[in-house]
């Protein structure tokens, strides 16, 4: 995203970059762009070619990968040209298109993380009922909603820019506006509200999972002296869930959900007969789940929070930042599109197998 307040040419004046600096910056950004493109393409191809991954939850991840791929293909390359050349030389129309695509795709990527968290929350806390509702149509509706909200958040500047008497300097390509209300509206809608919702959802997911781990431990202890079929029935009964295997295994929250798919317990499993051992296993799983959630939330917050803090303080005329700082924070946000395909697939064995198949085919 490239949003800034109106500034004078003097205030925008910066020290020209040396050839060496431009080369280093260009190489770094090209590597980021290339990796982002390849990783998101790999996710899309893995889901498209692997029947086992054709699940509603994975459709959300695929849509996220498509959105991040658009950031890598349509947004990052023009940003590299703009940064390296220190000025915009591609014309007013292309500038307008680039800024609109930038804001829409980045906002959409953030909102995808929100609906993925919501999908996982429902899958954990309302498993039986949501398993019936978790369909491809529902996933498509969630994706359509995300894109609609993103467009409503990012498009308003187009209308007032088209009515401005003075066009922005041809050497600049930034959204120049003095609309404080829009600054608040866009930052709240694109980041702060989704961030709040994501934090609440993952907090509740963790506590729900922790409770379910404890119930699973209790059900195992009570069913150790039953037959295998009796164990399966009793465990399902005690956990108030059902024995299924169609939960999405692509989620990093798989550690939370997978006990639904593996309720069957070997008879006379004396290894788990001691409360201390059961508690240790439960504690290990809780720590692993906490680490996964910490990675997801940490990557998202570290990538986008600095940018949106800058947007508020600059948009509200509290403080101004140099173009170098603005570019760095913008690309820090773009890096989230590189991290997403790693975080949302690397904890799942089905995705790992699909990636291995893709690599073997290329070899």
UniProtKB/Swiss-Prot annotation:
GO terms of biological process kind: adenylate cyclase-inhibiting G protein-coupled receptor signaling pathway; adenylate cyclase-inhibiting serotonin receptor signaling pathway; chemical synaptic transmission; G protein-coupled receptor signaling pathway, coupled to cyclic nucleotide second messenger
Pfam families reported in the protein's UniProt record: 7tm_1 (PF00001)
Membrane topology, Extracellular segments: 1-21, 85-92, 158-179, 317-322
Binding positions for serotonin per the UniProt entry: 102, 106
Superkingdom of the organism of origin: Eukaryota
Transmembrane segments: 22-45, 60-84, 93-118, 139-157, 180-203, 292-316, 323-345
InterPro entries linked: 5HT_rcpt, GPCR_Rhodpsn, GPCR_Rhodpsn_7TM
SUPFAM superfamilies per UniProt: Family A G protein-coupled receptor-like
Motif (NPxxY motif): 340-344
Disulfide bonds: 95-173
UniProt-annotated glycosylation sites, renumbered to this chain: 2, 5
Keyword Cell membrane carried by entry: yes
UniProt topology in membrane: Multi-pass membrane protein
Disulfide bond found in the keyword field: yes
Primary site of residence: membrane
Family membership: Belongs to the G-protein coupled receptor 1 family.
Function, as annotated: G-protein coupled receptor for 5-hydroxytryptamine (serotonin). Also functions as a receptor for various alkaloids and psychoactive substances. Ligand binding causes a conformation change that triggers signaling via guanine nucleotide-binding proteins (G proteins) and modulates the activity of downstream effectors, such as adenylate cyclase. HTR1E is coupled to G(i)/G(o) G alpha proteins and mediates inhibitory neurotransmission by inhibiting adenylate cyclase activity.
Protein name: 5-hydroxytryptamine receptor 1E
Organism annotation: Pan troglodytes (Chimpanzee)
């Amino acid at each position: 995203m490239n949003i800034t307040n109106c500034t004078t040419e003097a205030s925008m004046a910066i020290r020209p970059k040396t050839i060496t600096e431009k080369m280093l910056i260009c190489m770094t950004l090209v590597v980021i762009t290339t990796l982002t493109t390849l990783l998101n393409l790999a996710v899309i191809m893995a889901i498209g070619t692997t029947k086992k991954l054709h699940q509603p939850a994975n459709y959300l991840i695929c849509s996220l990968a498509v959105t991040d791929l658009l950031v890598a293909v349509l947004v990052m390359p023009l940003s590299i040209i703009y940064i390296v050349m220190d000025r915009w030389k591609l014309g007013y129309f292309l500038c307008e298109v680039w800024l609109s695509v930038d804001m829409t795709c980045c906002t959409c990527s953030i909102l995808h993380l929100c609906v993925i968290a919501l999908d996982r929350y429902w899958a954990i806390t309302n498993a039986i009922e949501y398993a019936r509702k978790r369909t491809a149509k529902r996933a498509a509706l969630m994706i359509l909603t995300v894109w609609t909200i993103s467009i409503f958040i990012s498009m308003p500047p187009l209308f007032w820019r088209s009515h401005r008497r003075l066009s922005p300097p041809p050497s600049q390509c930034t959204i120049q506006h003095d609309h404080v209300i829009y600054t608040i509206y866009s930052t709240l809608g694109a980041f702060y509200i989704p961030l709040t919702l994501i934090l609440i959802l993952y907090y509740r997911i963790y506590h729900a999972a922790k409770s379910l781990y404890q119930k699973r431990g209790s059900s195992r202890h009570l069913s150790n002296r039953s037959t295998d079929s009796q164990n399966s029935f009793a465990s399902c009964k005690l956990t108030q869930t059902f024995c299924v295997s169609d939960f999405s295994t692509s989620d990093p929250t798989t550690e939370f959900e997978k006990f639904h798919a593996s309720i069957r317990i070997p008879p006379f499993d004396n290894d788990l007969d001691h409360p201390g051992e059961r508690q240790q296993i439960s504690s290990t799983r809780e720590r692993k789940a906490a680490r996964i959630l910490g990675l997801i939330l940490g990557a998202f917050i570290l990538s986008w929070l600095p940018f949106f803090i800058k947007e508020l303080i600059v948009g509200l005329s509290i403080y101004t930042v140099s173009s170098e700082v603005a570019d760095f924070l913008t690309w820090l946000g773009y890096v989230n599109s590189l991290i997403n395909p790693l975080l949302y697939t690397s904890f799942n064995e089905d995705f790992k197998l699909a990636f291995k198949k893709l690599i073997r085919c290329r070899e």
